[in-house]
Swiss-Prot record:
Enzyme class per UniProt: lyase
Pfam family, one: D-Glu_cyclase
E.C. number: 4.2.1.-
Record's protein name: Putative hydro-lyase Psyr_0498
NCBIfam families membership: PRK05463.1
Family named by the database record: Belongs to the D-glutamate cyclase family.
Species classification: Bacteria, Pseudomonadati, Pseudomonadota, Gammaproteobacteria, Pseudomonadales
GO terms of molecular function: lyase activity
Keywords, ordered alphabetically: Lyase
Length: 264
């Protein structure tokens, strides 16, 4: 059995655990395979979001779009998008209504839902670690810190909002290398959008992320920020979308697609 087959077995096993109710962030799971953010909307909102993603490709790089009413994806053909993520969020009128590990019963109330699978920066973390760059939330066993920024996304139709960014502390002498490595993955957010000086992004306290967990920033390290696929959730809130389902931040959909597929 080759390494890709082993990784796909690990991904399938992880999705089975999530289907059975296990909840945990997915960073470091099934290394070598792409992970995705998810936003699911009624069909009447799908075109607005597709246009929003097209106008904001670094924050919302779309890897797949489902047919209306479908709960499957070509990214992992045996998976079920209603059950196979570890944790979901349900949104009503732009407000977080609940977090659930299974949304089948809610999905069944809507016949025309369209899911967007959006690239996730967890995908390039394997390459960072192979280069000897510490990925702090993995080494500390927690979720990646994510922050609302003051960077305004290009609006589309009824949708508008600001970019959410993820942060990884990187040793100052490795920042350029980290940017080169991640820049080879434009389909999963690509190169950083900002380095250092978080206040220029409107972030006043790195110890209090809006999503995820704070991580240690050691002497000689610089906070480096990437566009984040939680941006659609900020857009749902800002635009007061009547109904949506999303992944919970850090709790991704693990695909069967190798990371290398998105490497350029």
């Amino acid at each position: 059995m080759n390494s890709l087959q082993l990784a796909r077995e690990a991904a399938s096993a992880a999705r089975t655990r999530y289907r059975q109710g296990f909840v945990a962030p997915t960073a470091g799971e099934a290394p070598g395979l792409t992970q995705c953010n998810m936003i699911t909307l009624p069909r009447e909102w799908a075109y607005d979001f597709l246009l929003f993603a097209q106008r904001n490709p670094q924050a919302c790089p779309v890897l797949d779009v489902t047919e209306p009413g479908s709960h499957t994806t070509l990214l992992a053909e045996q998976a079920d998008l209603r059950t196979d993520l570890p944790l979901y969020r349900v949104w009503r009128d732009g407000q977080l209504a609940e977090e659930l590990s299974d949304v089948s019963h809610i999905w069944a109330q809507h016949t025309d839902l369209v899911s967007f699978l959006i690239g996730c920066s967890f995908t390039f973390e394997t390459d960072l670690m192979h280069a000897g760059i510490d990925v702090r939330h993995i080494s500390e066993g927690c979720n990646v810190p994510m922050y609302r920024s003051n960077r305004v996304c290009r609006p589309a139709g009824r949708l508008q909002g600001n970019m959410v960014v993820s942060m990884r502390p990187i040793a100052a002498d490795r920042v350029a290398e980290a940017a080169r490595i991640t820049g080879r993955y434009p389909g999963v957010h690509g190169a950083p959008v900002h380095v250092g000086e978080p206040e220029l992004l409107g972030i006043n306290d790195l110890a209090n992320p809006d999503f995820g967990d704070a991580v240690t920033i050691r002497p000689g390290e610089i906070p480096v920020f990437w566009a984040c696929g939680v941006t659609p959730q900020a857009v749902v809130m800002a635009s007061r979308v009547p109904f949506a389902i999303s992944h919970a931040p850090g709790h991704m959909f693990i695909t069967d697609i190798p990371d290398s597929y998105y490497h350029v």
